[in-house]
Amino acid sequence: MSKGVTATIIHRLVERGVLAYDEPLATWWPAFAAHGKGNITVRHALSHRAGLPAFKDIAPMAQASLAATGENLENAIPDWAPGASMSYHGLTFGTLLGRTAEAATGRSFAHLLRHEVLDPAGIDDLWCGLPDDPKLHARVATLHAPRDADPSTGIAPITADERAQNSGVARLFNSAEVRAGCMPAAGMIGTARAFARHY
């Protein structure tokens, strides 16, 4: 659900001419161009065709930091030429687009979320980075790992892909540090009503 909200921010910025679908991310985020990434466009990122489907060599908790994941992608080498193939960009989707939006506007992702999506739609209970409020934290559901997960991998037998979410994902997203961080692809927290109002 987070990716759709993030995409809404991007579409609104394109609508106003701040971003353009066929312009490289490096137009606004020059450091991203390193290692042959200078031709990856907003369209490639939105359509999971950027060639960067996963972070490499990043600590789990660092994935909750848009700055840390942005630096990780600046140093990354694409798995394929932009647009040549498609693979689900589970978490990198949010960093590619979130960091680009920040660079293009000079605003934080949380600010863009509030002013581009939430305020115009009258949404109060949705965050990318849960505020430090014990009452809010108490309302967040606890994630549980699949009961039939293989103890050696943490992956349920129904999933064929070894990169599928495992029991470590539940632990990661249950941590206060990750809930307080900004993960535009998967870390938004909100009520069902707030997400429904967006969609």
Language-model region placement:
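Active-site SXXK
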Residues: 1-22, 97-101, 198
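N-terminal, well-ordered alpha-helical segments
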Residues: 7-12, 23, 27, 43, ...
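Short, glycine/proline-biased beta-turn/loop segments that scaffold the active-site neighborhood
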Residues: 21-35, 121
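Short, surface-exposed loop or secondary-structure junction motifs
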Residues: 35-199
